Structures are given as structure tokens and as C-alpha cells.
Amino acid sequence: MSKRAFNFCAGPAALPDAVLQRAQAELLDWRGKGLSVMEMSHRSDDYVAIASKAEQDLRDLLDIPSDYKVLFLQGGASQQFAEIPLNLLPEDGVADYIDTGIWSKKAIEEARRYGTVNVAASAKEYDYFAIPGQNEWTLTKDAAYVHYASNETIGGLEFDWIPETGDVPLVTDMSSDILSRPLDVSRFGLIYAGAQKNIGPSGLVVVIVREDLLGRARSVCPTMLNYKTAADNGSMYNTPATYSWYLSGLVFEWLKEQGGVTAMEQRNRAKKDLLYKTIDASDFYTNPIQPSARSWMNVPFRLADERLDKPFLEGAEARGLLNLKGHRSVGGMRASIYNALGLDAVEALVAYMAEFEKEHG
């Protein structure tokens, strides 16, 4: 097998080599059963055991309290933009949303289809280069919930703090930074995360929801989108995304073997520190985000001359540094450095950046 490249894609993102090798070994014959996990009935004892272990491993990693349900659903995080208000926003209620970029704006637009949304704060006032402090927020006293995106993958903004919302449930899109460091789940009413960044392959979304928030869905909420339906049926009301669930379980096992989220925090800190240090020490590369709001997972940067973007990307690909092109709405470059990428990937990237700057700077 040829050497694997370093994949800096924002999602679907890199998976740990050990996980892919395990999946490859079990692809045709799972543990001597003579069939692939892809071919298993989701009702079989073997698959139920796979699913249950994945849930327990995730509970262990995040120390999820017993009064929270863990759901493995389909539709991705974008479907949650509708599912959350359908389940949590009464017809006469108000939901508070914090706007920090493209993904939170999409959530806001979708929620407005189902009820009243108060944009309690927006990073637009800071050109989306900083996150408004909570003292700048205008929260609704009796809001149904407060929603924010903990990390904006496109703009590269990340909260380094958890908002205080009192008795109002706190809801967060944690698609791109879940499992990157320790987390106090008890601070939240609901956490959701599309799998294809830091959990596993695409086709799956994980929802962690406090039990007292179940059973509040509107009468028009489709059965399939009702969290209580999923919770009451072990996320198997219909056939789930079985293989994505299985692979995510392998990722959870791998994370535990690496030392869990505490070890991931140390590893991720080293990666982001090296990359931002390289950018800040250069007159050739720039990142405009306020340092306290810089994402650990998604690092956008620009070159001094955008005409050099194409040769930079071509040179990177030739060196096995893939998917560094920034999002089409932002331009420039973006390095997504999720859990699966090691420090060696960032070291290879910054070495290339120094080489390119020396040649073109």
C-alpha cells in the first residue's frame, strides 16, 4: 500500500489509520460470523451489541450523566436545525440564537420556519472575527432554549467558554469540536454533532439530550423527527445508519486507547499552537480571528497574494497534504486538524508553508 496522505478536509474528514485497518480486517467477516457488519440485521444480537458498546464508550469518554439519552440518528446536523425547534420550541414560544457564522445562521434561518427567533448576539458586529461576550447578549427571560454553534468550521471561530443560561436549556451544535477535549455535559440541555468530522463517517448525527426535554414535540412533528420516538426505540425506530454507527464505535474505542479526551486535548493543543505560531510569525500568512476565539479544529489562513493560492495547493497536494482549499464563501486556505490527524501532519504542513514562503515571499 502506498503511503497515506495527510487529509485536512473539513468533512468528511480523516479517520484514524487504526480504525480503517480494523474495519478493513472485519469487512468481509465480522469476528468469524461469515458476514459484514453492513449485511447484519440491526435487530440481531450481534449488531445490538455493537450499537450498545458504541453508546457506552461515548458515555465513558464524555462522562455523560445517566439522565441523558444518547441518540444515533440520520440526517446529519443540518436536519437538527429543524428537528430542534420541532421538539423544543412551542408555537407561542421564543428561542434565542447566537450568530457566529455560516452554520449558526443556517440554524437561525431554519428555526424561523417554526417559530419566533431572537438573535441574542451576533459576531457580525466584529466582522465574524470575534465572539461577543455574554455581557453583550440580549437573552429572552423565558426562552424555550438558547442555541449556539461551539465551533464554526468555515470561519474558524470557537467558543472557549460555555454560556450561562440559568434554567433555560442550552443547545449546541458541536459537530466539529466534540471529543476534542473534556466537556461538562451537564451544562447542556442538548448537544448534537454530525459524525463526519470528529466522530466517524458521514450519514450519522449524535444527539445527547436531557431526558426532561423529551416529550415536548409539537403535534405536527413527524414521528421520525421526534426525539422521544428515537429514545424509546434505542435509535432503531427504523433501520439506522448501521455501518456509520459501527465505525463511530471503533473511533470511540480508539479514543479510549489513546487516553480519552484529556489526551486529545493535549494533542490538539500542540497541533493548533504549532500552526498558529507559524502563521503569526510570518508576514506571508495571516489569520484574522481574535486569538481567544480561534478554533482548535479549523484553521483558516490566507497567503499574501491570492494569485499564489493555486500553486500553493498544487505543491501541497504533490506532498500529500490534501484538502487545504478554504471554503468557497471565504477563500484562502483552511487546515482542519481533527482528532484523527497527529502532530506529524501539522509538522509536515508548517514545513511546507515555510518552504513555500521562502520561494515566493
Curated annotation (Swiss-Prot):
Catalytic activity: O-phospho-L-serine + 2-oxoglutarate = 3-phosphooxypyruvate + L-glutamate; 4-(phosphooxy)-L-threonine + 2-oxoglutarate = (R)-3-hydroxy-2-oxo-4-phosphooxybutanoate + L-glutamate
Biochemical pathway: Amino-acid biosynthesis; L-serine biosynthesis; L-serine from 3-phospho-D-glycerate: step 2/3; Cofactor biosynthesis; pyridoxine 5'-phosphate biosynthesis; pyridoxine 5'-phosphate from D-erythrose 4-phosphate: step 3/5
Cofactor stoichiometry and binding remark: Binds 1 pyridoxal phosphate per subunit.
GO MF: O-phospho-L-serine:2-oxoglutarate aminotransferase activity; pyridoxal phosphate binding
Binding site for L-glutamate: R43
Modified residues (N6-(pyridoxal phosphate)lysine): K197
Keywords: Amino-acid biosynthesis, Aminotransferase, Cytoplasm, Pyridoxal phosphate, Pyridoxine biosynthesis, Serine biosynthesis, Transferase
InterPro entries (alphabetical): Aminotrans_V_dom, Pser_aminoTfrase, PyrdxlP-dep_Trfase, PyrdxlP-dep_Trfase_major, PyrdxlP-dep_Trfase_small
Residues that, per the record, bind pyridoxal 5'-phosphate: A77, S78, W103, T153, D173, Q196, N238, T239
SUPFAM superfamilies noted in UniProt: PLP-dependent transferases (SSF53383)
GO cellular component: cytoplasm
Any one GO biological process: pyridoxine biosynthetic process
Required cofactor names: pyridoxal 5'-phosphate
Pfam families given in the database record: Aminotran_5 (PF00266)
Disulfide bonds: none
Enzyme Commission number(s) of this protein: 2.6.1.52
Location relative to the cell: Cytoplasm
Family, as annotated: Belongs to the class-V pyridoxal-phosphate-dependent aminotransferase family. SerC subfamily.
NCBIfam families: PRK05355.1, serC_1
Function: Catalyzes the reversible conversion of 3-phosphohydroxypyruvate to phosphoserine and of 3-hydroxy-2-oxo-4-phosphonooxybutanoate to phosphohydroxythreonine.
Subunit structure: Homodimer.
Name of this protein: Phosphoserine aminotransferase
Source species: Pseudomonas aeruginosa (strain ATCC 15692 / DSM 22644 / CIP 104116 / JCM 14847 / LMG 12228 / 1C / PRS 101 / PAO1)
Lineage per the UniProt record: Bacteria, Pseudomonadati, Pseudomonadota, Gammaproteobacteria, Pseudomonadales
